Amino acid sequence: MNKRMNELVALLNRYATEYYTSDNPSVSDSEYDRLYRELVELETAYPEQVLADSPTHRVGGKVLDGFEKYSHQYPLYSLQDAFSCEELDAFDARVRKEVAHPTYICELKIDGLSISLTYEKGILVAGVTRGDGSIGENITENLKRVKDIPLTLPEELDITVRGECYMPRASFDQVNQARQENGEPEFANPRNAAAGTLRQLDTAVVAKRNLATFLYQEASPSTRDSQEKGLKYLEQLGFVVNPKRILAENIDEIWNFIQEVGQERENLPYDIDGVVIKVNDLASQEELGFTVKAPKWAVAYKFPAEEKEAQLLSVDWTVGRTGVVTPTANLTPVQLAGTTVSRATLHNVDYIAEKDIRKDDTVIVYKAGDIIPAVLRVVESKRVSEEKLDIPTNCPSCNSDLLHFEDEVALRCINPRCPAQIMEGLIHFASRDAMNITGLGPSIVEKLFAANLVKDVADIYRLQEEDFLLLEGVKEKSAAKLYQAIQASKENSAEKLLFGLGIRHVGSKVSQLLLQYFHSIENLSQADSEEVASIESLGGVIAKSLQTYFATEGSEILLRELKETGVNLDYKGQTVVADAALSGLTVVLTGKLERLKRSEAKSKLESLGAKVTGSISKKTDLVVVGADAGSKLQKAQELGIQVRDEAWLESL
């Protein structure tokens, strides 16, 4: 029976690839169904012989309890956006300062959900969402139901690949028709539908909705020397790679491709929202490196957003956690990018003056970055009033005088006891990217603050279960869950806490970078600004902001109180040791290692202070080689780069 099951699995997987990947089926649907039923019968009779790559894993029935957090071994960076040819020119100029004659590769920017797929010995072991780039959610069981994702690879590889999971337009129409017939609300757009599907706890629902993928990158150190070769390699492994791409030598060629894609966009069977431009050569990518948030070797050109006219009804002014006062326009409702929009940001007081926005104006609204509704400009031909908007002089929360500093575009409240700032700071502290306290959202924080149960973030850790029962609408079960979530957050790695403190210019990526170097918030609080500014990707502005924050008596008291309540102040990730054996060295791993997994070798190198990259360049200090090292070993020898073997690495 095992032989026949092997034959059926191989046949069905080949036919599925022909159908879903190549769009060139060699058998009829009825023949596929006949073979599939035969396999199901055999697997039912011999469950102990079911193969890992059996197509039956893709259908049917598992109801999941939830999604576990998953730490990405290789961080997923965001991309810098560009909205004009001039911004692409600026990107090209920055690249050419480091790379004399770059070749670019242009790929379609699929409007889906970023995913990371990890294979061990050629078997899919983890499918994860992007999350915040460092930690995502493990949705492996759902991604196994996406029919064009290989469950096994033709080689026994340890590899992590990245791509986009999306819902084709035809599938979107079918899903929405079914929801309409069932009296369920329709999805606004294919991206929302894909996101909602991947969040399903019932995997059978995922299997029915016909999601698809395009893979675009090997995240683990690549064995290829260019992005184009990497894409071809992914195709060889059985992944679906978007064929619509070009190599370009200059911005004119890139711009022509963007214009061509823009004209074809509506006729594609899937949604795109732009074109991604990357330096093709991987060694050049290594030379260019990264900022804290994004690679310097890539940019995402975004197509102009959809625009609609709406009438300005009124303006609300709100205070954020840093004291900035932001105006929000209340508008006549309009349909925009699949959703109803009745509020849009006006950014700041200088923006209102620059655009000369007045009462009752008709304005053009769009979604900035396809996400945030914003007012773009006034339709002056439809102006009905010359009356200017009322600009507040006092804080809408605490009534303190508002200031408008010369070097700032916004009004600002500088009262440290401003209730709105304190409450927004508490909401930020509990948010997903900060301390990630499940259930402690804005509405609960507002109730706690109004009940005078919390005045600063340390108070959160003094709360007891019974305190939550004092809040309207909170029952015993919810109170217990909130208390447990707060206790669990005490164990977070310290970069979550540092970001949660809301220090100006210190975002989540900067927080992680700082803690990798200083290992604890207490060490960081004692560091001098020169030491902070010397860290790669940081600088004087961040160093000064940290120095200002930690110099205050309030910060010292707050850290002491947090520590006393049991909150962890130490970094739990991979640290950088200043005097480690390989501190500051750029190292490339190549070839097949005999005793260590590649991930183990990478972790060891990083623990010794090395930066592990995938391509050899003039910035490479050391190459660790295994069997069949090939062209990378040859290139290292040509460049005179030091070469070591696996035994040497194990001896460190």
Curated annotation (Swiss-Prot):
EC code: 6.5.1.2
Pfam families, sorted: BRCT, DNA_ligase_aden, DNA_ligase_OB, DNA_ligase_ZBD, HHH_2, HHH_5
Entry GO CC: cytosol
UniProt-listed CDD domains: BRCT_DNA_ligase_like, LIGANc
Residue positions binding Zn(2+): C395, C398, C413, C418
InterPro entries: BRCT_dom, BRCT_dom_sf, DisA/LigA_HHH, DNA_ligase, DNA_ligase_AS, DNA_ligase_CS, DNAligase_adenylation, DNAligase_N
Transmembrane segments: none
UniProt superkingdom: Bacteria
Cofactor(s) annotated in UniProt: Mg(2+); Mn(2+)
Residues given in the record as NAD(+) binding sites: D29, S30, E31, Y32, D33, S78, L79, E107, R130, E164, K278, K302
Active site: K109
BP GO terms, sorted: DNA repair; DNA replication
Domain BRCT positions: 577-652
Keyword annotations of the record: DNA damage, DNA repair, DNA replication, Ligase, Magnesium, Manganese, Metal-binding, NAD, Zinc
Record field: catalytic activity: NAD(+) + (deoxyribonucleotide)n-3'-hydroxyl + 5'-phospho-(deoxyribonucleotide)m = (deoxyribonucleotide)n+m + AMP + beta-nicotinamide D-nucleotide
GO molecular function (one): DNA binding
Protein family per UniProt: Belongs to the NAD-dependent DNA ligase family. LigA subfamily.
PANTHER family per record: CHROMOSOME TRANSMISSION FIDELITY FACTOR 18, DNA LIGASE
Function, in words: DNA ligase that catalyzes the formation of phosphodiester linkages between 5'-phosphoryl and 3'-hydroxyl groups in double-stranded DNA using NAD as a coenzyme and as the energy source for the reaction. It is essential for DNA replication and repair of damaged DNA.
Name of the featured protein: DNA ligase
Organism of this sequence: Streptococcus pneumoniae serotype 4 (strain ATCC BAA-334 / TIGR4)
Gene (name only): ligA
